[in-house]
Amino acid sequence: MTTTDPVANLAALIRCPSVTPAEGGALSLLDTLLSPLGFAVERVMATEDGTPDVENLYARLGTEGPHLMFAGHTDVVPVGDEAAWSHPPFSADIAGGEMYGRGAVDMKGGIACFVAAIARHIGKHGKPQGSVSFLITGDEEGPSINGTSKLLEWAAAKGETWDACVVGEPTNPDQLGDMIKIGRRGSLSGRITVQGVQGHAAYPHLADNPIRGLLQLTHALMHPAFDHGTDDFQPSNLEVTTVDTGNAATNVIPARATAAFNIRFNDSWTAESLRAEIIRRLDAAANEGELRPDRAPVKYEIVWADRPSHVFLTRNNALISSLSGAIETVTGKEPKLSTTGGTSDARFIKDYCPVVEFGLVGQTMHMVDERVAVADLETLTRIYETFIERWFAHADGK
């Protein structure tokens, strides 16, 4: 295999059926690509009770600073109905100028391109004046417990430090060069349970319908808006994601009702201040009687999900200007600096070094017939290669 060819790199990666949390041969393949370039490659198995064991990879070229990290994941989401695919999901077939396969854009394509980019850099200039590392997990599409966070802890414990990181997630909405992600909103989830009294639907006075109380509470969580956005972030937004009574009968008032919610929040809040605001709203709504006239206040219980994701924003000029300049040089486009979208493993990396995200076009990620334009693989490789040159020149003060 020619390591400098992103198309060949990606085809080989797609053919590894690494549906989370399976390694599927993808990390072994990366080992064979990176070791000949001089990278010291280590495989790290992470474990935690109640979760699948996950294998991860850390590879470093060089021993001195400045130190640039590329981060990503080789695990992919399930393919769904394989019969619905026009090309087998692990075939890496090319048709109409596009390569088909699960993980093509999310995010084996980004990994394939950065491998090609550093291989080209070494071929032209030799090893960088500093260090480059790959931090690759097999647990990004899963619970994200035995992946990037534990790999970072492991690496930091052995003395690894980094000056900047690029995560190769598919950040572009429409065309390559559209967008760099320089931050992410936080994410907080919880589950509310309201206890009632079960009874016959024809005799509501003999029961206490918990759905009425739950509606009061969830309405208070969605109205009014938590904020109207900030200079760098969209407005915080709460969505009720499940409602359940455990009751299939239409003539029975249920004994309890439960609702789960998720809020994506901006830098107006922390997870702690947001929890306090949610409790304040729930307590106020519990005492209202619009949906429960002549009833006692709603009794509710709230359970918070573990590990909220905290909001972050990167303002590192060397990192952002080097990447933005590389994109403009290669594509002629000035990328938008954005904080939109969901969470990513950048939320873990931001505690160790400045981090941004840039990869392929994400229109088909997680979909049937996930695919990438072959031409985009070459373009992204050129962007990454130019970025590597610019970042090390900037970091060295040249």
From Swiss-Prot:
Its EC number is 3.5.1.18. Zn(2+) 1 binds at H73, D106, E169. Its cofactor is Zn(2+); Co(2+). Transmembrane segments: none annotated. The keyword Transmembrane does not apply. Zn(2+) 2 binds at D106, E141, H366. CDD domains: M20_DapE_proteobac. GO terms for molecular function: acetylornithine deacetylase activity; cobalt ion binding; succinyl-diaminopimelate desuccinylase activity; zinc ion binding. Keywords: Amino-acid biosynthesis, Cobalt, Diaminopimelate biosynthesis, Hydrolase, Lysine biosynthesis, Metal-binding, Zinc. GO terms for biological process: diaminopimelate biosynthetic process; L-arginine biosynthetic process; lysine biosynthetic process via diaminopimelate. The active site is at D75, E140. Binds 2 Zn(2+) or Co(2+) ions per subunit. It catalyses: N-succinyl-(2S,6S)-2,6-diaminopimelate + H2O = (2S,6S)-2,6-diaminopimelate + succinate. Pfam families: M20_dimer, Peptidase_M20. InterPro entries: ArgE/DapE_CS (IPR001261), Bact_exopeptidase_dim_dom (IPR036264), DapE_proteobac (IPR005941), Peptidase_M20 (IPR002933), Peptidase_M20_dimer (IPR011650), Peptidase_M20A (IPR050072). Belongs to the peptidase M20A family. DapE subfamily. PANTHER family: ACETYLORNITHINE DEACETYLASE, N-ACETYL-L-CITRULLINE DEACETYLASE. Catalyzes the hydrolysis of N-succinyl-L,L-diaminopimelic acid (SDAP), forming succinate and LL-2,6-diaminopimelate (DAP), an intermediate involved in the bacterial biosynthesis of lysine and meso-diaminopimelic acid, an essential component of bacterial cell walls. HAMAP family: DapE. Homodimer. This is Succinyl-diaminopimelate desuccinylase. It comes from Agrobacterium fabrum (strain C58 / ATCC 33970) (Agrobacterium tumefaciens (strain C58)).
